[in-house]
Amino acid sequence: MKRNFDSVKRLVIKIGTSSLVLPSGKINLEKIDQLAFVISSLHNKGIEVVLVSSGAMGFGLNVLDLETRPAEVGKQQAVSSVGQVAMMSLYSQVFSHYQTKVSQLLLTRDVVEYPESLANAINAFESLFELGVVPIVNENDAVSVDEMDHATKFGDNDRLSAIVAKVVGADLLIMLSDIDGLFDKNPNVYEDATLRSYVPEITEEILASAGAAGSKFGTGGMMSKIKSAQMVFENQSQMVLMNGENPRDILRVLEGAKIGTLFKQED
């Protein structure tokens, strides 16, 4: 299927913790700089971009020099609150190199479930777009409790990115991950696994091919990405799942390159 994203004027990009934090726990500064360059380039072309960024836990572990994610909910929230400050500080610094202004929006599930607070959130996004600001969104881990096993959480930032795409009326959601896209079976187990370039619907076969996942820094897996694609379909939008190793590939995707997996219902 030929890809054409010429009509995309509003875009949500989701980046996961594994793309921001190295296996050693150190912050991937080079990748963050590339991401800021790409988003700034799109912004300069008149495309409105929202960045949904995980990473608060990973940044917090780095700042506090902790090797493992705490088991206790309160400590998880504390580490995330420390990490969120560090992450936004770095984003603000890096984006400023490209003369791009950013803001922070921390959401909880109840914000989008109640009409009044949802309207306020929409107004905030629209006002930021009018001001030429790139909103950076994360879940408010310091006060949310259900991803951390307890119900004000979205579940993970894959789901959050799909919800944000709906809230802002995005033309496209690009989800950056540590895999190349959706395969017909687990590529870490089967050498003959084949990348699916195009998915027009979420079938039982596709659901069955989604395995478990998550790193010590993050929470998302393939199943959460499939469920996010289902939400995107329900909102009559589209999603690309691609490897976040080289953020500049986002520009190639928007030019029509067949990178990753395109989730798009047939016209």
Curated annotation (Swiss-Prot):
Q: Give the coiled coil ranges.
A: none
Q: Which gene encodes it?
A: proB
- Give me the reactions it catalyses: L-glutamate + ATP = L-glutamyl 5-phosphate + ADP
Record-annotated residues binding substrate? 54, 141, 157
Known EC number: 2.7.2.11
Note whether Kinase occurs among the keywords. yes
Where is this protein found?
Cytoplasm
This protein's GO CC annotations: cytosol
Among InterPro entries, the record links this protein to:
AceGlu_kinase-like_sf (IPR036393), Asp/Glu/Uridylate_kinase (IPR001048), G5K_ProB (IPR041739), Glu/AcGlu_kinase (IPR001057), Glu_5kinase (IPR011529), Glu_5kinase/COase_Synthase (IPR005715), Glutamate_5-kinase_CS (IPR019797)
Q: In which pathway does it act?
A: Amino-acid biosynthesis; L-proline biosynthesis; L-glutamate 5-semialdehyde from L-glutamate: step 1/2
Q: What does this protein do?
A: Catalyzes the transfer of a phosphate group to glutamate to form L-glutamate 5-phosphate.
Q: Which GO terms describe its molecular function?
A: ATP binding; glutamate 5-kinase activity
User: What keywords appear on the UniProt entry?
Assistant: Amino-acid biosynthesis, ATP-binding, Cytoplasm, Kinase, Nucleotide-binding, Proline biosynthesis, Transferase
Q: What is this protein called?
A: Glutamate 5-kinase
Protein family (similarity comment): Belongs to the glutamate 5-kinase family.
- Top enzyme category: transferase
Residues the entry annotates as binding ATP: 14, 177-178, 219-225
The biological processes this protein is annotated with in GO are:
L-proline biosynthetic process
Instruction: Specify one Pfam family.
Output: AA_kinase
Can you tell me where the transmembrane regions are? none
